[in-house]
Design a protein with these regions (language model features):
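Protein kinase glycine-rich loop
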Residues: 20-27, 31
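Activation segment signature within eukaryotic-like protein kinase domains
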Residues: 119-120
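Short proline-rich PxxP-based motifs
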Residues: 225-239
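AlphaC helix of the eukaryotic protein kinase fold
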Residues: 49-70
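Conserved short submotifs of the Hanks-type protein kinase catalytic core
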Residues: 87-101, 105
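Protein kinase catalytic-loop region centered on the HRD/HxD motif
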Residues: 123-135
Length: 332
């Protein structure tokens, strides 16, 4: 794989596209806004900074394209229109154009509980569809949940996705977004849908609090501190109903087999009425159907409301590089 500094990439030539202008640059890719000439449609083009020099890189790009294409029929997954490789061997994906991400939103103003719950229902439903089709996302985080004028939440970036026929666990610390990753991903356990559930619950917590679960400030903790944080209770959120926090704690249990499935999480959120003045019975938990190719975790009863123990993948080949940990932990 050959890396090209993002600022050094010239505007690429993509057949059938015109008016390319940079929307965002990162260590992993550059995203352009463009017009699809044949239909006059505005689109987003993600051009990776690397070139496809070896079979592993080619397989990873194909994995993302196949996973995104397989999922894009869902209303809350970003539409993928086409893929290809530029003349200088940079892979690209042509996708639905969105207005921004929930990482942008949470930096400006945290979401209220009702909006966060509604985003959770939509993305959990996308994960239900994904897991039922043998696709694990593995990088759910605020930067990968986008919004537009016509769609409040869509899941993007299947760059770390695992397909049912490719059950590898080749996610290294360099490509994790640790703020939203469950403890088993640091142990390189076999991929499962439980990791996506954890990441979604951590994301919903973050968009309401303005920072990831258990973090006391916006400063990035050391890796040792981060691992110790998994043993700390997840705090309450001021102004957020305890019942919503309890559901999120349930999804962020340190034991992946104790978390709800994506389907259970979706239904728990969907049945959660957030008027604090209205008494409610505990939400029911049931065992969701188990797809053959993606074994879901085993459910357990909903925990009490009291605390219990418990952005585009950022790829860096040189962890000692200045600024690595800040970008790595925040997923920006």
């Amino acid at each position: 794989m050959t890396e090209t500094p993002p600022g050094a990439l010239p505007v690429p030539y993509v057949p059938g596209m015109s008016g390319l202008s940079v929307m965002a640059r990162g260590g992993y890719a550059t995203v352009y806004r463009a017009t699809q000439d044949s239909v006059g449609r505005d689109v987003a083009i993600k051009v990776e900074n690397r070139t496809l020099d070896n079979p592993r890189d080619q397989a990873r790009f194909l994995r993302e394209a196949r996973a995104a294409g397989r999922m894009s029929s869902h209303p809350h997954v970003v539409d993928l229109f086409d893929v290809g490789v530029t003349v200088d061997q940079h892979p690209y994906l042509i996708m639905e154009l969105c207005d921004g991400s929930y990482l942008d939103r949470m930096r400006v103003s945290p979401l209220d509980p009702v909006e966060a719950r509604d985003v959770g229902i939509k993305i959990a439903d996308a994960l239900v569809h994904s897991h039922a089709n043998g696709v694990l996302h593995r990088d759910v985080k605020p930067a990968n949940i986008l919004y537009s004028e016509f769609n409040a939440a869509v899941l993007a970036d299947f760059g770390l996705a695992v397909l049912g026929e490719m059950r590898d666990s080749s996610v290294t610390l360099e490509v994790l977004t640790p703020a939203y990753a469950p403890p088993e991903m640091f142990r390189h356990d076999s991929p499962s849908g439980a990791a996506d559930v954890y990441a979604l619950c951590a994301t919903l917590y973050a968009v309401m609090s303005g920072r990831p679960p258990r973090w006391e400030s916006n400063r990035s903790p050391s890796i040792l501190t981060l691992m110790d944080l998994f043993n700390h209770p997840i705090p309450e959120l001021p102004g957020v109903p305890e019942r919503l926090v309890a559901v999120l704690r349930y999804g962020m249990d340190n034991d992946p087999t104790a978390r709800p499935t994506a389907e259970q999480l979706r239904d728990l959120l969907n049945n959660l009425h957030l008027d604090p003045s209205t008494p409610q019975p505990p939400p029911a938990v049931y065992r969701a159907p188990r797809p053959n190719h993606v074994p879901p975790p085993r459910p357990r009863p909903i925990p009490p409301s009291t605390p219990t123990l418990d952005e585009t993948p950022t790829v860096h080949n040189n962890p000692d590089r200045k600024g690595f940990f800040q970008k790595w932990f925040f997923g920006g």
